[in-house]
Amino acid sequence: KLIGIVTERDLLFANSKNLIQDVMTKDVITAKSGVSIDEAKELLHNHRIEKLPLVNESGLVTGLITSKDITNNADYPNASKDNKGRPLVGAAVGVKGDFLERSESLLEAGADTLVVDIAHGHSENAISTVKHIKKAFPNCELIAGNIATAQGAEDLMKAGVDAVKVGVGSGSICITRVITGSGVPQLTAVMDCAKIGRDYGIPIISDGGTRTSGDATKALAAGASTVMVGSMLGGTDESPGTVLTKNGKRFKVYRGMASLAAS
């Protein structure tokens, strides 16, 4: 039940020894579940607040609308969201150990799609993992990769994936081709896999080698339905890497998906 709200303003000059009940705002402005965006905007503006808790008839919290939610909704109307208005989220799992338990926990936490994400996706472990996840969670949207051949794409599609991630060694920091001596140039790999994808009605994701807008255009023209980017966004404020400063310039730590640091 809602008894108060704590925002950044409440904590700004608070003593670290203070209890939550001592710093929280107790007289909270609320709205009923199902309030419209326009009604929420009016309440936020009239009361000069930034956060609006939503409560049901029993006073239990059912949601929260913030001023940033409303501005983001207006600024980015085409953002990919779920039926609750939240950004779509994908979560990666491996192919060993407790991947089923991890998959269940991620789906319960609200993940919209799972990704069986390993450096060599055309392997018995990856195919077996796909089959087990789809059997346990048949309604789960499942992506698997990475692969670089038509046969790899077909084997994953037969196993039950909903999308295939294509790209081995093409990423900006990927060394798989160098270490293994195996790989396919990205455009060729996408074209080969897209042919199989069309036969099965399953989309292809081009993952790697997208350093410019032109690279994305080529991947889409070659048959990819989606393009994944890493290095293009790796230095943004929103990316999760640690910030380092070298010679007065700011950098972000950037890791490969199969690196020891990432795992």
Where are the predicted features?
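Catalytic cores of alpha/beta
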Residues: E101-A109, L142, A148-V166, S206, ...
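Catalytic beta/alpha-barrel core
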Residues: T30-K32, K51, A92-G94, D112-S123, ...
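Active-site-adjacent beta->alpha loops and helix N-cap segments on the catalytic face
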Residues: L60-S80, D98-E101, I118-L142, I147-K158, ...
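The conserved cystathionine-beta-synthase
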Residues: A31-R48, V55, T71-A74, L100-S105
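Alpha/beta catalytic cores of nucleotide-metabolism and tRNA/nucleoside-modifying enzymes
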Residues: A31-K32, A92, A159-D162, G181-S206, ...
